[in-house]
Amino acid sequence: LREGGFSAGFTWDDFIQDLVSTEGTLTAVAEKLCAARKWEEDVGSVERALRRLRSRGQMAGGKWGSRTLAVFGLPGGVRARLRWMGAYHSRFTDLPVSVCQDLVRLWDHPPTTERREDRVWLALARTTIALRQNDFAAARTELERAEPDLTVAPEEARIEAALAHAFMASRTAPADVAALLERVPPLLLHVTGGEDRACLLARYIDQRAYALGTIDGGTQDGAAREKLYRQIPTKGAPPFALCRRANGLAYALWKQGRRQEAAAHAREAARHAGDGGHVRMRAMALAMLARIEQGPEAEDARVRATSIGQRLEDE
């Protein structure tokens, strides 16, 4: 819990200390802040304000907390941790639900919650936790509360929200899924991070494919799903995306009666999940293999998938 040199109990003192380490001295931090504010205040006054700010612990930072964050932002390691918790395709979701809840609580305070573009990731993390508990009402509440923050959030966060809305609709209002997923492609155009983009694309395609089985009585299943899953790129793709592709193909081929090919893809999905350390994805792949295969291998896969789910506290 000390990635980037910060404990989970990140405080204003930690924030100021990071700025001092970067700029050299507290005076240098104050000078940079003064310059950004067009010298509305003198350096001495700002330096004293920063000394008061670093004693605020995890309380609201007031005007100087807001001003300092506006100029410098949170440290890169802290921002990365918040994004990690908010991304469904990260290994945050491979932790037991109770551990995920503890981690979110440990970061859910100032200074990490002072800016909208930072705290939105905590809302997304809480949404994922609620979905893992099959608590759609709580997930919707989190997303509704996050709407104002999403307007200034990066594209990745807005895609996360759109995919969460579409996932819930696929279980409760299938006719709404297509419109919800239409929000994703324009946002994906602006996602430049290779691994994040690959995972988000794989999740988008996966949800489009799932929707095919919920409309017209499922008549658009099988071959149409296979065509979609084959659109997920494989060259240089991270294990998460490769697992989603293989598991999706396993189901699509199984629906077409191609059981041996389907089982091979399910085994491939389990292998990719293991390579990436994605425990939940491995459970899904094993569950798929249990549906496709017969006999001892199917029973073994079913038992292993169930055991993983219990250990992760998934509903």
Regions flagged by a language model, labelled:
Residues 29, 239-240, 250-252, 257-315:
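Long, ordered, amphipathic alpha-helical scaffolds
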Residues 85-95, 120-135, 157-174, 198-217, ...:
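Tandem amphipathic alpha-helical repeat scaffolds
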Residues 1-38:
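A short, Lys/Arg-rich alpha-helix, primarily the initiator
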Residues 23, 90-108, 128-147, 170-188, ...:
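Helix-turn-helix repeat elements of alpha-solenoid scaffolds
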Residues 76-85, 89, 106-114:
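A structural signal for repeat-array scaffolds
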Residues 34-60:
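Recognition helix of helix-turn-helix/homeodomain-like DNA-binding domains
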Residues 58-78:
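DNA major-groove recognition helix of helix-turn-helix/homeodomain DNA-binding modules
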Residues 111-115, 150-154, 190-195, 232-239, ...:
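Short coil/turn linkers that connect adjacent helices within long alpha-helical scaffolds
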